[in-house]
Design a protein with these regions (language model features):
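Membrane-proximal, glycine/serine-rich, low-complexity loop/turn segments characteristic
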Residues: 1-133, 147-183, 214-232, 274-276, ...
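Extracytoplasmic loops and strand-loop junctions of Gram-negative outer membrane beta-barrel proteins
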Residues: 34-37, 84-91, 139-146, 157, ...
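C-terminal extracellular loops and terminal segments
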Residues: 63, 321, 418-422, 439-502, ...
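Outer-membrane beta-barrel translocator domains and adjoining extracellular loop/strand segments
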Residues: 76-84, 130-139, 185-194, 238-248, ...
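Outer membrane beta-barrel strand-and-loop segments of large Gram-negative receptors
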Residues: 91, 208-212, 255-259, 270, ...
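Surface-exposed, low-complexity loop segments enriched in small/polar and acidic residues
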Residues: 126, 131-144, 172-204, 226-257
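Signature of Gram-negative outer-membrane beta-barrel scaffolds
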Residues: 225-328, 456
Length: 588
């Protein structure tokens, strides 16, 4: 499959090159409505990514087709040491194979200067196969374990957008609708000392729908009124089952707090209203209010427990902006927003990593509410641009990973709501061009965090200062040669229960353009010195826990990209790797 896809992409490169040459020869006769881009990136460990972007443009409508695919193997080495009622050491070797195909179709229609239609359809088919070998040592026993998970997902998402323009940017009405349906499958097998111990089967069917209407009106004094309503709903049905065998070790499976699944429904009704106006030559203000009525219905299938919540929230926002010149801008922003837990965090199924380590979501998580006040300063000149941001965040019921120990030394990775998390931070980004062929962009983020809360006797208190920084160098020549170096650093950071050690890496890339930059050849090295790693240690007196995880991030990539007929790059329908959520990293 991998070889065939590569051959297809190279064939497309050849076809597009010939098409571009033909188009140039006939450019004076007719304007070719086709444009596009084909790219292929390959590393030296048999991983690749590929993209095909095509556009067809007519007077009153445009059609776009995007394809993105990747196939890569990720190797992760992890260590976990724990000491609670006993000491346990684990060595884990994980190999994940990611295979993904994504397709997006977009149709833009402009039947008149006052009407705009947009239709979009996305299809995503990621598969992740995980093989994990674990050596587990206690003071009295030693086991060799093997865990295999075959995760697959099918997602279809469609959206429709309409805008009626009475007067551009002054008087407009827009309607928007989105529907998404996903089907997940997650069968797995587990062996201890080469003996089958259990199998599991699981599936989820998350869906969501969003309907929205927005209205913009400009008064004679140039003040703008924006208002709208929105309906959002998501629902999911999860079903997971564990099946043990006669070889089950110490009957550990029967002692788990298992849950077969969850039925979850959420309905959010929203209305918003805001008013903005330019006051004089230098000042602009915007004030608004956003209101949500949130209905949540949760049913646990194991014990038929129901947990229902009805909540009504107000979210005010305010902006004051001062622009003394074309080169400077000073602004104050206040916002209040809600962040809802996702289905990975809500799923109550107890997922075994090994017979002493488990993952389990928390179906009783509540949305976190963040109040944010910030002062932003922007300075942009001919050769320099400065962006500074001083902020204060206060998050009620902040969602955080939590690690639970039991008396038999069992470790459960879950989630909970803390009480309050406050952050004071400063972000500074400076971009300078000392010459026409060089750009230097240093950036730094400073943050002081204070959090508190308790969960099942666990203290979630944090009082910590940390910082991170990036340094990016770009060199560009007139002969379409580009060189980029990026160094990134993250200082040690404290989170509830743990201290995470520093992490840093260096990436290098060079790109050369040919045929007036239509064909681009690139070579890059990620994590040049192979320094990126994950280390976390417990910062409590109740138990000791240390986690080390090293992903094979050092890689060499070579890429080819061909643009024809002046194609303008657009965001592709790519599927990213799963987000890392837990503090304890074991190649999940």
């Amino acid at each position: 499959m991998k070889k065939r896809i590569t051959q297809i992409l190279f064939s497309l490169l050849t076809f597009c090159t010939n098409a571009d040459i033909y188009a140039q020869e006939n450019e004076k006769k007719t304007k070719n409505p086709w444009s596009g881009s084909v790219s292929l990136n390959y590393d030296f460990t048999n991983n690749f990514t590929g993209n095909v972007n095509l556009g067809y443009t007519q007077k009153n409508w445009d059609l776009f087709l995007d394809y993105s695919g990747h196939s890569d193997r990720i190797e992760i080495s992890s260590e976990l040491f724990r000491s609670f009622s006993a000491e346990t050491s684990q060595l884990l070797e994980t190999e994940q194979h990611h295979l993904s195909h994504s397709v997006a179709i977009q149709l833009d229609m402009r039947p008149s200067s006052r009407n705009l239609f947009l239709w979009n359809l996305k299809l995503q088919f990621p598969k992740i196969t995980t093989n994990r070998d674990i050596n587990n040592r206690t003071q009295t026993k030693e086991y060799d374990l093997h865990h295999r998970i075959a995760f697959s997902r099918k997602t279809i998402e469609g959206s429709l957008f309409y805008k009626h323009i009475y007067e551009k940017a002054k008087h407009e009405l827009s309607l928007n609708g989105i529907f998404s349906h996903t089907k997940d499958s997650r069968p797995s097998t587990y062996q201890i000392d080469n003996l089958p111990t259990y199998t599991s089967s699981g599936n989820e069917k998350p869906k969501f729908v969003r309907l929205q209407m927005d209205y913009l009106y400009t008064f004679e004094n140039q003040g703008q009124l924006e208002t709208g309503i929105q309906f959002f709903s998501r629902w999911n049905k999860t079903r997971y089952n564990l099946h043990d065998t006669e070889e089950t070790l110490d009957n550990w499976l029967s002692n788990l707090p298992l849950n077969d699944g969850i039925n979850h429904h959420e309905y959010i009704y929203t209305a918003h209203l805001s008013y903005s106006r330019q006051q004089g030559e230098f000042w602009l203000y915007k004030i608004g209010l956003h209101a949500d009525y949130d209905i949540t219905r949760t049913k646990l299938m194991e014990n038929t427990d129901k947990h229902n919540f009805d909540r009504f929230y107000f979210y005010p926002h305010l902006t004051l902006q001062y622009t003394p010149s074309d080169q400077q801008e000073l602004a104050f922003h206040f916002t209040r927003k809600a962040a809802h837990p996702d289905y990975t965090q809500l799923n109550p199924f107890t997922n075994p990593i090994d017979h002493q380590t488990f993952e389990q979501g928390n179906p009783l998580l509540r949305p976190e509410i963040t109040n944010r006040a910030e002062i932003n300063y922007l300075l942009h000149g001919e050769k320099i641009q400065l962006n500074g941001n001083l902020y204060f965040n206060s998050t009620e019921r902040f969602i955080t990973p939590v690690t639970l120990f039991s008396e038999d030394n069992t470790l459960t990775l879950s989630y909970t709501n803390g009480s309050m998390e406050n952050k004071v931070g400063l972000d500074i980004n400076l971009s300078g061009s000392p010459t026409s062929w060089m750009t230097i962009t240093p950036s730094i983020s400073l943050v002081h965090a204070h959090a508190n809360g308790k969960y099942q006797g666990i203290n979630l208190h944090v009082d910590d200062f940390s910082w991170s920084g990036n340094l990016e160098l770009n060199f560009n020549s007139k002969k379409h040669t580009e060189f980029q170096a990026l160094f990134s650093y993250q200082s040690p950071t404290k989170v509830p229960q743990f201290k995470i050690e520093e992490n840093y890496y260096l990436d290098l890339a060079i790109k050369q353009g040919f045929f007036n930059n239509r064909l681009q050849v690139s070579f890059s090295v990620s994590d040049v010195f192979d320094t990126s790693e994950w280390q976390a240690r417990s910062n409590t007196d109740t138990y000791r826990l240390a986690n080390y995880s090293k992903e094979a991030t050092h890689a060499y990539w070579i890429g080819l990209t061909f643009n024809f007929n002046n194609f303008t790059s657009r965001s592709s329908a790519d599927d990213s790797h799963p987000q890392k959520r837990q503090v304890i990293q074991l190649g999940q």
